[in-house]
């Protein structure tokens, strides 16, 4: 068990002994430098994985990226597209005795999948709904100031709630 106040060293690295200089081996060996003892241990799969940035912050990455993309586009253009390519047969071979040649192209048959049939007769008519006529109160409230709007709303609710004579409200479900 390590003494209190000391950092635990990772496996493969030893804590400095009494004969050591008092500094840890980590402080002496930075990323990319070899340990003091001279043995060529590499802790990791590659020395590049030490977390050091390979690109300088001078805009060179963008240039490299653009060059790489241009090269890929050139390669795509040079390569033929994947898929079966059939050479067009000569017209005389296509019009042989077993193959009558079509003159009209794809033909008059069209797919009706997903299409409306029947033209405009079956389509719903939209935008023809008659507008609701405004009542006199609504016309007054639209023109008037805030107080007139408030009073019109109060009148509307009083008409629905109760009469002044019997002070009863109609049943509400």
From Swiss-Prot:
> Does the keyword Acetylation feature in the UniProt annotation?
yes
Q: Name one GO biological process term.
A: rRNA catabolic process
Q: Can you provide one Gene Ontology molecular function annotated for this UniProt record?
A: 3'-5' exonuclease activity
Q: Which UniProt keywords apply?
A: Acetylation, Exonuclease, Hydrolase, Nuclease, RNA-binding
Role of this protein:
Exoribonuclease that is part of the telomerase RNA 3' end processing complex and which has the ability to cleave all four unpaired RNA nucleotides from the 5' end or 3' end with higher efficiency for purine bases.
Query: Assembly state and interactors?
Result: Part of the telomerase RNA 3' end complex which contains about 488 proteins.
Tell me the protein's name. Telomerase RNA component interacting RNase
What species is given as this protein's source? Mus musculus (Mouse)
Native organism taxonomy: Eukaryota, Metazoa, Chordata, Craniata, Vertebrata
């Amino acid at each position: 068990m390590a003494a209190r106040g000391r950092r635990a060293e990772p496996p493969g690295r030893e804590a400095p002994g009494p004969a050591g200089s008092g500094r840890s081996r980590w402080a002496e060996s930075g990323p990319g430098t070899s340990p003091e003892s001279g043995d060529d241990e590499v802790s990791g799969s590659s020395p590049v994985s030490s977390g050091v940035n390979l690109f300088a912050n001078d805009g060179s990455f963008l240039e490299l990226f653009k060059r790489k993309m241009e090269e890929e586009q050139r390669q795509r253009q040079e390569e033929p597209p994947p898929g079966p390519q059939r050479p067009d047969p000569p017209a005389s071979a296509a019009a042989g005795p077993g193959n009558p040649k079509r003159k009209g192209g794809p033909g008059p048959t069209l797919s009706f999948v997903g299409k409306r049939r029947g033209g405009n007769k079956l389509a719903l008519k939209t935008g023809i709904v008659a507008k609701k006529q405004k009542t006199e109160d609504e016309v007054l409230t639209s023109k008037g100031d805030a107080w007139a709007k408030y009073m019109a709303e109060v009148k509307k609710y009083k008409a629905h709630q109760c009469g002044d004579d019997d002070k009863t409200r109609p049943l509400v479900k």
